[in-house]
Amino acid sequence: MLGIPGPPTPPYTITGKLERAPGLWKFVQSKWRVGESDLTGEVTIDERQKPEFLTARLVSQKLVFEDLAPLVGAAPTRKTNVSAKQAQTQQQLEASGDLFPNVPLNIEKLRAMNMDVTLDAKKVIAPPWLPVQAMDFRVVILNGVATVKPLTMSVFGGGTIQGELIMDARTDTPKVRANLRAGEIELKNFFRESRYFDATQGKIQGHLALAGTGRSLAQVMGTANGHVALALGGGSISSLMVSLGGLQIFDALVLYVTGDNRIPIKCAMGRLNFQNGTVTFDRTLLDTQKSVLYVQGHASLQSQAVKAEVDARRKGFDLLDLHGTVRIEGKLRNPQVGLGRVFPLPTPVIGTAKDVACADLTQQLLAAP
């Protein structure tokens, strides 16, 4: 109605006071309800500048992460407040097994108006696999280039994710760049509302530096270059995650399980290198009491498929060596896990693997460009 470029949203209601002065619109005392999220604040549109300039200072007492899903073409998983187009997108993703939606983004809106918008979300309601509890950011759009900086997300347990996002939409094929760092994030919070929560412990550090091009999230990830690095200095994971693959896989990985279904972890780390949408596992390992697990392989973000192997190297004496690897293949959304060729040898095996120098390797992994 006012010609303001904005993102697609779930159903919304807005109340407030609209003020008009020569060349200036002000929307004050505003209250917004977007999907299940709320916003309050002040919006100003200055028509005297060319292009027009929008300034907004917004606060949310409750921000439901799924209400941001339309920004990347995704659909909320909830059953209410979902448009027919969003529901169709979700059905297509589930049917194809794809991880990223290929819904074109309306980038032309970024060129229509310059903006300076801040949002302080006091409470974030996120999916169980994303342990964000609050966030604040500033979005500045100048001549088709959108910069989200600073971006800060507070995580359950005291951890944070900080960094910046940039989208250059001056051309028809936008360029997207992200640089984020994560620190002191409790691993178990990624498994909220699951049976793995109680047996999972440890704190994660990480760094994400990715750049890609495209008009949809699937296209951007399918052309991405850069890396994602993660490290866990110690803790435990639930043995139930591994047991889903069957007893043979459990034996092949040579894992020690405590009485409360924990697998003690001395160290874990991994680096995913992205090159034109192809992801390669680099220095990806899990150091446990009885063995060191090494992951090798690759994934394609164009076909959204993965093919990887996990090889266990024993640290000590064992009566049986399965001489096999665990294979992970299929769509990223739902891969299959199974054993490669296995040759049981009924002879004692003396393992030679050593503990990983966790602190030094973690420093190298997260410091690398």
Identify the meaning behind each predicted range.
Residues 17-23, 30-33, 37-50, 56, ...:
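Extended terminal
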Residues 68-72, 236-245:
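Outer-membrane beta-barrel and related beta-rich outer-membrane complex signature
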Residues 8, 129, 200-202, 262-265, ...:
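Short sequence motifs at beta-strands and strand-loop junctions characteristic
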Residues 77-111, 120-124, 341-369:
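Interface/linker segment at the passenger-translocator junction
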Residues 1-106, 122, 130-177, 181-199, ...:
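Acidic, Ser/Thr- and Pro/Gly-rich intrinsically disordered regions
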Residues 53-55, 112-116, 175-177, 221-227, ...:
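Outer-membrane beta-barrel architecture
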